Amino acid sequence: MHVKKGDKVKVITGKDKGKEGVILAAFPKQDRVLVEGVNIVKKHVKPNQLNPQGGIVSQEAAIHVSNVMLIDPKSGEPTRVGYKIENGKKVRVAKKSGAVID
């Protein structure tokens, strides 16, 4: 997966196209990510210990990883991600600027 938790991404397709946010969680087995403030859904919650009232709660739902693009740390624009070996370690590289991401 080309993105991971804590990365700043931009949504490139879907109802939230153009929105930017930070990845809260990544689910590699399902190829999905949870992005802050994107794909908000309303969930009906039964009363429980944490929420004695119950009711309808708004929360983020996961979106497919192919619908997001990493934001280049140098230019602030969406970029594709490449990989290269640096000092014996595999690092992510922004295709647009060539900047090392992590």
Swiss-Prot record:
GO cellular component, one term: ribosome
InterPro entries registered for this protein in UniProt: KOW (IPR005824), Rib_uL2_dom2 (IPR014722), Ribosomal_uL24 (IPR003256), Ribosomal_uL24_CS (IPR005825), Ribosomal_uL24_KOW (IPR041988), Translation_prot_SH3-like_sf (IPR008991)
Keyword Nucleotide-binding found: no
Keyword field: Ribonucleoprotein, Ribosomal protein, RNA-binding, rRNA-binding
Alphabetical list of Pfam families matching this protein: KOW, ribosomal_L24
The keyword Manganese is assigned to this record: no
GO biological process entries: translation
GO MF: rRNA binding; structural constituent of ribosome
Subunit structure comment from the entry: Part of the 50S ribosomal subunit.
Family in the record: Belongs to the universal ribosomal protein uL24 family.
Function statement: One of two assembly initiator proteins, it binds directly to the 5'-end of the 23S rRNA, where it nucleates assembly of the 50S subunit.
PANTHER family, sorted: MITOCHONDRIAL RIBOSOMAL PROTEIN L24
Protein name in UniProt: Large ribosomal subunit protein uL24
Organism name: Lysinibacillus sphaericus (strain C3-41)
Lineage: Bacteria, Bacillati, Bacillota, Bacilli, Bacillales
Gene: rplX
